[in-house]
Amino acid sequence: RIFTRLGIEYVIVKADAGAMGGSASEEFLSPSPIGEDKFVRSAGGYAANVEAVTISAPQELSVEGLPAAVTHETPGTKTIDSVVAFANTSLGMAEITAAHTLKHIVLALTDVNHKRSLVVVGLPGDREMEAKRAEVAFPGFEVEPATEEDFAKNPGLVKGFIGPVKNGAQFLGEKAESKIRYLLDPR
């Protein structure tokens, strides 16, 4: 009630309880254009901090009637912006935006025994990886971006050219050639 008495707008959001906090946690946040925390809110009243938000997987879209996928060589395009520019100028495609692309972030997970493994997360090209969300997604692991040493140990992972398929075969995935876990973030 103190926020109301002080005239401060606030939202109660679902939050990550952390390693010691138990299974449920809520935070009181005051919407502001500045600050370090982000949250989402639905018209139906659901509100959650970005690291604690849960969403349903999107419904599968039918590919029936769509043209077959085509692979394009994209030399020198190591960023989403350069892929978009290349697609719009060199390939004669309709107006492509970063939201039409998929980028891959390579994360290193270190467990309590200091065993390090990699995971590749695909997310829409117009979005950034939320560090807190990544930490919550992999409980029990220290999570950080893959290092140059990680890339050197995995020569199949070439910055700017990482994808689930390589040379027509499944490359990413625990049962694929690389044995590197592969996840998609649908939000």
Name each region found by the language model.
Residues 1-187:
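Extended, low-hydrophobicity, polar/charged segments
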